[in-house]
């Protein structure tokens, strides 16, 4: 019995269609990011962010983002997402920023009717992969305390005073 050429063509077309579906994925995964993360940095604590200015959507931003380290005077990755009320992206901006630019995260309605702007910041290497789409996503996520001081002089004086009183009472 001879195999049918029609069946062979059907199987071949099915295989090609599956390959095309896989090739048109429009989102990055964490595995993709692993390949972008080198083992050395140009300075201690060096990090990267996805960077783009007014890209059409998240895919276009992340796809063409330059693979460079953020300047030393920055500490966070910033993302601003402008979208229609339906959720369709209008504009995506991502960059490295200092703390001051991360103090107003959240979502707000734009002056243009029907637009919503959500802003988020994060701390970490290439942490700004996803887009903020609502108040739950539009946050300021840090891995370390924002207000880091070199010490607490008031606490030290209280401890010393307590020790002085304790030593004075036990003598």
UniProtKB/Swiss-Prot annotation:
Keywords: Cell membrane, Cell projection, Cytoplasm, Disulfide bond, Glycoprotein, GPI-anchor, Lipoprotein, Membrane, Secreted, Signal, Synapse, Synaptosome
Recorded topology in the membrane: Lipid-anchor; GPI-anchor
GO biological process: positive regulation of canonical Wnt signaling pathway
GO cellular component: cytoplasm; dendrite; extracellular region; membrane; membrane raft; neuron projection; perikaryon; plasma membrane
NxI motif (motif): residue ranges: 88-90
Residues modified by glycosylation: 134, 147
Pro-peptide positions on chain: 148-171
Pfam families (alphabetical): UPAR_LY6_2
Gene3D superfamilies linked: CD59 (2.10.60.10)
Residue span(s) of domain UPAR/Ly6: 47-141
Signal peptide (from-to): 1-25
Compartmental location: Secreted; Cytoplasm; Cell membrane; Synapse, Synaptosome
Keyword Repeat set for record: no
Nucleus keyword on record: no
GO molecular function, one term: acetylcholine receptor regulator activity
Residue positions of covalent lipid attachment, annotated as GPI-anchor amidated asparagine: 147
Organ and tissue specificity: Expressed at high levels in the cortex and cerebellum of the brain, at moderate levels in the lung, kidney, and liver, and at low levels in the heart and prostate (at protein level). Expressed in neurons (at protein level).
Disulphide bridges, residue numbers: 49-77, 52-61, 70-96, 102-121, 107-118, 122-127
Top-level lineage group: Eukaryota
Protein task: Acts as a modulator of nicotinic acetylcholine receptors (nAChRs) function in the brain. Inhibits nicotine-induced Ca(2+) influx through nAChRs. In vitro, specifically inhibits alpha-3:beta-4 and alpha-7 nAChR currents in an allosteric manner. Acts as a positive regulator of Wnt/beta-catenin signaling.
Comment, domains: The UPAR/Ly6 domain is sufficient for inhibiting alpha-3:beta-4 and alpha-7-dependent nAChR currents.
Oligomer status and interactors: Interacts with nicotinic acetylcholine receptors (nAChRs) including CHRNA3, CHRNA4, CHRNA5, CHRNA6, CHRNA7, CHRNB2 and CHRNB4. Interacts (via NxI motif) with LRP6.
Official protein name in the record: Ly6/PLAUR domain-containing protein 6
Source species of the chain: Rattus norvegicus (Rat)
């Amino acid at each position: 019995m001879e195999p049918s050429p029609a069946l062979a063509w059907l199987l071949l077309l099915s295989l090609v269609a599956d390959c095309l579906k896989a090739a048109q994925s429009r989102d990055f995964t964490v595995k993709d990011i692993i390949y972008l993360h080198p083992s050395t940095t140009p300075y201690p604590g060096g990090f990267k962010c996805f960077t783009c200015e007014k890209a059409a959507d998240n895919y276009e931003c992340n796809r063409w983002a330059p693979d460079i380290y953020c300047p030393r005077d920055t500490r966070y990755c910033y993302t601003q997402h402008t979208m229609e009320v339906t959720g369709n992206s209008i504009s995506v901006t991502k960059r490295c920023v200092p703390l001051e630019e991360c103090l107003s995260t959240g979502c707000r309605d734009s002056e243009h009717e029907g637009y919503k702007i959500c802003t988020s910041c994060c701390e970490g290497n290439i942490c700004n992969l996803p887009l903020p789409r609502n108040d739950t996503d539009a946050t300021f996520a840090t891995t370390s305390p924002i207000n880091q001081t070199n010490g607490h002089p008031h606490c030290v004086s209280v401890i010393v005073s307590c020790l002085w009183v304790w030593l004075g009472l036990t003598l």
